[in-house]
Regions:
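Thr-Gly-centered strand-to-loop micro-motif
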Residues: 41, 67, 146-147, 168
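A conserved hydrophobic position in a structured secondary element of the catalytic/binding core
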Residues: 14, 90, 151
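Conserved AMP-binding/adenylation subdomain of ANL enzymes
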Residues: 20-37, 44-131, 140, 161-165
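Conserved A3 ("GATE") glycine/threonine-rich loop of ANL adenylate-forming enzymes
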Residues: 93, 147-155, 167-172
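Alpha/beta-hydrolase fold catalytic core
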Residues: 131-136, 141-149, 153-161
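Conserved S/T- and glycine-rich ATP-binding loop of Class I adenylate-forming
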Residues: 2-5, 38, 88, 159, ...
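Conserved AMP-binding A3 loop
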Residues: 1-23
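Gly/Ser/Thr-rich helix-start
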Residues: 5-8, 12, 50, 149, ...
């Protein structure tokens, strides 16, 4: 079903070739190999969740982990540290909450802001912030794919600044 942006929700038929072309694209562009881990957080009723988290992961021989509880930042962080997923796909709110809770307070402190103004120290602080963010998300991933809603501009600017590997996904 579509979300009904131009009216009421309505069913949409997706042909096999459309779904398979997306799976084939994933094989070309995303680094999942047999035995890699995927944490499924997106709804299976959402095309991206079904294609990437399930069909592509299954076809690639990855191990797919489904969260059985409502995903909170704490549950997600624990899951990522145990599972160590290769590529992560999620909605912006998950990344925003984790970054705002665990990383930004350290960098936005008085001393953090002061150190970010010192050229050589600036690079070290950004590197440490990037490494801390990578560890929160399992420390084993190549990229986080974020989509399904607008992304917080402050968090996005911060992730760009520290060189964090992410992609904003958009689909129709």
């Amino acid at each position: 079903y579509t979300s009904g942006t131009t009216g009421y929700s309505k069913g949409v038929m997706l042909p096999y070739r459309s779904i398979w072309s997306n799976v084939a694209y994933c094989f070309e562009m995303l680094p999942v190999k047999p035995g890699d881990h995927i944490v499924s957080m997106l709804p299976m009723g959402h095309v991206f969740g079904m294609v990437y988290d399930f069909l592509y992961g299954f076809s690639a021989g990855a191990h797919i982990y489904f969260l059985t509880r409502m995903p909170s930042p704490k549950i997600i962080s624990q899951s990522f540290s145990e599972i160590k997923p290769r590529v992560i796909s999620c909605v912006p709110l998950i990344v925003e909450k984790i970054i705002k809770k665990d990383i930004l307070p350290k960098v936005d402190s008085k001393i953090g802001k002061l150190l970010l103004k010192v050229p050589i120290v600036n690079d070290k602080i950004k590197s440490l912030a990037r490494q801390a963010a990578m560890e929160i998300f399992g420390g084993n991933f190549d990229e986080i794919i974020i989509g399904g809603a607008p992304f917080n501009a402050e968090v996005e600017a911060f992730l760009k600044k520290i060189g964090f590997p992410y992609t904003i996904a958009y689909g129709m």
